[in-house]
């Protein structure tokens, strides 16, 4: 169909891949032409008449034609696929692999929208890195010191391969800290914000939802009203960033298409701010953001298929 753009997903079995398929199905300008999964090969793709999952290796991908290829693969698995995709095809990589690379465009539209228009190689941001950057970006010029971030996510962030961080028995009535130093999303946020920061993630027994609490040292005293005004101004035209007068909770982010930012508090001396950001780790933290990036790369209205 000439008025629609074709999209293929490699790694469609995972939680993010499944959300991508659902969003593509509902998008008026996109057509899903293949969905790759070794485990689901031969099964019908939900919401698609006549389309079945296929096992697509890099050689197999070279035989397909699509305007966009989304790689929803584990870290380190995507480059053989990137190597067979021509320069005229948009590649959106969900993994960490290219988030620090200068020759890929970093896909956080609220901060880097103009670079994403017409881009052909897009590194989709990580879920924690998205929330962290949305929470810190309006304060970059005011920070004096190292912000400290506490992150909590539902266990879907650990993927579908069984392990300690998605084991329901271990997670029951529990909170699991992991990767206490040098988490990839910390490196990513540091790189693209241009700020040092410290971040520790934790897994929660909920399936989805993500929360980041940021403690931010400031170079001069600031009132709560000024703090809130910075965020109101920065995100006034951003439909996927909701500024809240309340303290966001993890459950508020679950199922939400964007990021909820709130909890604005200030220490008595006005030099330490607290900001909280909540999102759905599978949506704005992955699939929704990928759809924004696809739209921008193709010249489609950015929020088509997402809002309205």
Locations of the language-model features?
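N-terminal Rossmann-like NAD(P) cofactor-binding subdomain of oxidoreductases
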Residues: 1-178, 265-269, 304
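Short glycine-rich or small-residue beta-strand-to-loop segments that form or flank ligand, phosphate
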Residues: 6-9, 123, 213-215, 275-278
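C-terminal substrate-binding/catalytic lobe of Rossmann-fold NAD(P)-dependent oxidoreductases
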Residues: 15-18, 22, 27-60, 155-276
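Secondary-structure boundary/capping motif
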Residues: 131, 223, 285-286
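Generic structural marker for isolated residues within well-ordered, non-membrane alpha-helices
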Residues: 136, 186, 291
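Active-site catalytic microenvironments for nucleophilic, acid-base chemistry
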Residues: 138-142, 217, 293-300
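C-terminal helical cap and adjacent loop that interface with cofactors, partners, or active-site loops
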Residues: 251-308
